[in-house]
Amino acid sequence: DDLSRGLGDVYKRQNLISFFNIKLMFKKNFYALVCGLLFSLGFAPFDLWVVSILVITCLLFLAEGLKSRDLFYLGYWFGFGMWMTGISWLYVSIHYHGNVNIIGSSFLIIIFVSILSIYSALTFLLYSSLKNYDSKMGMYFALPSAWVIIEIIRSHLFTGFPWLISGTMIGESLIDGFTPIIGAQGNTFFIILLASIIYKIVDCVNKKIYPLPQFAFLILLICFSNLAKQIEWTYQAGEIDVSLHQPNLTLEEKWSQFGIVKTQAMIYNSIEEAQIGELVVFPETALVISENDNLDFMNEIKLLSTQKNLTLVTGIVERENN
């Protein structure tokens, strides 16, 4: 009887511990979702990149002491929040321009966001492995490395979705001095590194440890980045005339015979009116008819462009293997 009661007490305690662990993870995942919603404020038009850096710092505190599986879920819910706010324009495109009802549009967005969030989950899963590989350096470089690796994979896998590249948020800011050298992906590493250093500074303060090395590292990075901004990394090699054209057609008009004819006329007229050597740009998929189905027009504008030594840049619907 005593043994049975003892085992029963142990079982109850285990259930109680499991309950509190589940409750704690639920709270952490909810906070991660909120962090994801706030992270997108770093991108245009808000440009609150400082908020985004602090959000990652908060996320690192949420990640403290978590196992790989829990980090996967934490990253997933962070990604869910980030993508829900970061690609809200897709809902506008699907609902208002694609004429899909509210329920259908919302369903498509949720499915898309759910898939994209896996990338953020993988980021934190990789972070867990890198952090354990080298505990001293991992606290600073594990998350930046994991973030950049997964961003690069996301930009290329399955034709890629290079949207919300974190490093782009500090463009034209006080700390974008390294951009000409390291590019957007390098900037991603840079801002996540800043967040990691801030996390370590706060952690040291909480443990009553003076964070002089971390604070000095942070100040040096910011100062060097600002100094690099003063350097002219490029020089002007010449000038080129550019004309940018937007057909301004509704979706229905664009895919109609009327829209095709109007777009072709605009392209032809823009080439005729362009200066010699000019760059003529029609953004996105201006021509919604394949080259094989439109050979006469394509050959005509190619000839005209060659005669005027100009370049035409546009998108076109293409079909392969019939």
Describe the role of every protein-language-model region:
Residues 7-9, 18-23:
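Intrinsically disordered, low-complexity serine/threonine-rich segments
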Residues 228-322:
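Soluble catalytic regions of membrane-associated enzymes that act on cell-envelope
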Residues 2-5, 45, 158, 237, ...:
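A generic fold-level signal
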Residues 1-14:
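Single conserved hydrophobic/aromatic residue that forms the stacking wall/gate
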Residues 1, 176, 302:
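Active-site phosphate/pyrophosphate- and oxyanion-stabilizing loops and adjacent acidic/basic residues
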Residues 1, 150, 283:
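Active-site flanking residues adjacent to catalytic metal/cofactor-binding acidic residues
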Residues 12-13, 18, 278:
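Intrinsic disorder/low-complexity segments
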